[in-house]
From Swiss-Prot:
Listed name of the protein: Phosphotriesterase-related protein
Entries under PROSITE patterns matching the protein: PHOSPHOTRIESTERASE_1 (PS01322), PHOSPHOTRIESTERASE_2 (PS51347)
GO BP of this protein: catabolic process
Keyword line: Hydrolase, Metal-binding
Cofactor: a divalent metal cation
Keyword Metal-binding: yes
Residues bound to a divalent metal cation 2: E169, H201, H230
Binding site for a divalent metal cation 1: H22, H24, E169, D298
């Protein structure tokens, strides 16, 4: 029987409830720090407060405090928001911190125990530039062995074996680095053997998701067990997105809550708004793709947590879904995107 492998053990898919499929509760994002504009250097070097928050929202990756999403303050704020997520109807969170992002399995387990939210942890590799010496030269075979052990055997955390429940996020730049190609191929190989879900992080160019899927499918991975993340900042043209959808993977809009006039990680594009995300999802629903759509926030900086003036993990449930209902999306369609699709993606027979 297919089950979902959480950090506290396996559960039946129907117990997941509403699920956020791409989040982080602790990670190190300092690699993406950008020097602040000279005019705002003092504000962005200062501690985040009401008097500096406006600058942090404009230049989130220019505040070192903001990208340190792993210190005690961040963990306390994340726990508070997971509890709010639970209060507002949240059931499960898929934690996408992989090798290179300094995943904190101990904290994820503690959150699962203390909040009652189901957590599914990922294995896999982030971009090559963020790997330490022990991982930077791994072969496909070594990666495959590592991923399978993380899923089948698990890692010891405070005396208990904690197993990962999917492979992800598997991240790449563009052109895709050879190390990242190995990670994508290893994900495809292990997916074929184990049947688990996989989540991909493409670079911020339209060609990237297509190339990732080619490598993954050639390695043996199933399209219907693969999520392509961050498509709301990668493929902006709906016709092109529909063309990509023909490959059969899940289409994930996972930057809900990110609304900015200046996108620091790709200054050549304008980040779409939540309203535009809703409109695009409605267009995809009308094209018959409701069974391939997923939604999340990809929270990875402090300023998106409520303790720092952000929206928290409950934003989709409390602010986005009501707007979708107002625009004619049905409860059945919302349940498909937030409950059924995540369960179908995550369920496998380990």
């Amino acid at each position: 029987m297919s089950t979902v492998q959480t950090v506290l053990g396996t559960i039946t898919p129907n117990l997941l409830g509403r699920t956020l499929t791409h989040e982080h509760v602790a990670l190190d994002f300092e690699h993406f720090y950008r020097p602040p504009p000279p005019d705002f250097e003092s504000e962005l070097k200062a501690k985040i407060s009401m008097s500096t928050l406006g600058y942090v929202r404009l230049y989130p990756y220019s505040s070192k405090e903001n990208v340190r999403f792993y210190d005690e303050e961040a963990l306390e704020a994340a726990k508070k928001d997971v509890l709010l997520y639970k209060k507002h109807g949240g059931g499960s969170i898929v934690e996408n911190s992989s090798y290179g992002l300094k995943r904190n399995l101990e904290f994820i387990v503690e959150l699962a125990k203390s909040t009652g939210v189901h957590f599914i942890a990922g294995t896999g590799h982030y971009i090559h530039a963020m790997q330490d010496a022990s991982h930077a030269s791994l072969t496909v075979e070594q990666m495959s062995d590592l991923y399978s052990k993380d899923i089948i055997t698990g890692q010891q955390v405070n005396g208990q074996m904690v197993k990962c429940g999917f492979i992800g996020e598997v991240a790449s730049v563009y052109p895709i680095h050879d190390f990242e190609k190995n990670a994508i191929k290893a994900a495809g190989e292990i997916q074929e053997v184990l049947g688990c879900g996989v989540s991909m992080h493409p670079h911020r160019v339209t060609k990237a998701p297509f190339e990732i899927m080619r490598l993954y499918l050639e390695a043996g991975g199933r399209a219907d067990k693969c999520v392509m993340s961050h498509l709301d900042r990668t493929i902006f043209d709906i016709d092109e997105l529909l063309e990509f959808a023909k490959l059969g993977c899940y289409i994930q809009y996972d930057l809900f809550g990110t609304e900015c006039s200046f996108y620091q990680l790709n200054t050549s594009v304008d980040m779409i708004s939540d309203g535009q995300r809703i409109d695009n999802l409605i267009k995809l629903i009308k094209e018959g793709l409701v069974d391939k759509l997923l939604m999340s926030h990809d929270i990875h900086t402090k300023h998106r947590l409520t303790s720092y003036g952000g929206h928290g993990y409950h934003h989709i449930h409390t602010n986005i879904l009501p707007r979708m209902f107002d625009r004619g999306v049905t409860l059945e369609q919302v349940e498909q995107m937030t409950v059924t699709n995540p369960a179908n993606w995550l369920a496998f027979d380990p």
